[in-house]
Amino acid sequence: MKKLSVIFLSVSMLSGIAFADKDKVVATYKGGEVKESQIMKEFKPQLNLQSGETIKNFDDFPPQDQEKLIKIYVNNLLLKEEVAKSNITSSKEFQEKLENAKNQLAQQELLANYIKSNITDKMFDDEYNKYVGNLKGKEQIKVAHILVKSQKEANDIKTKLSKGGNFTKLAEELSLDKASASNGGVIGYILLNQPGQLVPEFEKKAFALKVNEVSTPVKTDFGWHIIKVLEKKPVPIPTKEEAKVTIDNILAAEVLKKYIADLEAKANLKIMLPKADSKAGS
């Protein structure tokens, strides 16, 4: 009986050790310690949302990311302690800012709830079908460019390219668009007439080019561009799941626009400013 008790005690102790190891202390600081569970509770929801992947354990993060998360968590704790020691929250200015922040948060919550309750499955399906219909038969192109300040610089680059110069190397060395220059001038795939994508002058010239053709210099508000088309292919038709974020954003914008217009109408809003024409003529 005594032997069985010893065995049972040993198993219990081992189980306790194993359980304790599941929530390891990953950092200590003056006044406390940080466990894996605290980090996961603090960051897991937003990290899953940002990455689109399910993060289950602290060990799923690379070591460098683990250290960053620990530092962010501890820094927040330390700043919270500093706030508690100060009188900053009792000032009139802070209270006004706090009230403004609460109002903004309440408005965001109101609008989010309104959107959620006013977008139906039928609205989503109709908008998706419209969205897909606009994509059918369309072409997308993969473009690269070299951006410079003057027409002379652009002409010089065009001359170098016509003599066998390497577009990728010239983009890396000379382009003012550093984001694409680091990738040999490659911007990526674009569609024609997509709002907020690229300026019209650039698009018009790019879509007139053949694959591997290089444009003459093109002027935009950004400077002078030499454009090259790397690839052309049909626009892929996204599934409902793939298009969900885009469709949700389109519908949300439409619903909110109508909601705000209705509020203004109910409030009988009248703008009392003078008309633009009368101001210009005075």
Curated annotation (Swiss-Prot):
Pfam families: Rotamase_3. It comes from the Bacteria. GO terms for molecular function: peptidyl-prolyl cis-trans isomerase activity. Keywords: Cell outer membrane, Isomerase, Membrane, Rotamase, Signal. InterPro entries: PPIase_dom_sf, PPIase_PpiC, PrsA_foldase. It catalyses: [protein]-peptidylproline (omega=180) = [protein]-peptidylproline (omega=0). GO terms for cellular component: cell outer membrane. It is found in: Cell outer membrane. SUPFAM superfamilies: FKBP-like. Its EC number is 5.2.1.8. Residues 1-20 form the signal peptide. PROSITE patterns: PPIC_PPIASE_2. Residues 138-231 form the PpiC domain. Belongs to the PpiC/parvulin rotamase family. This is Parvulin-like PPIase.
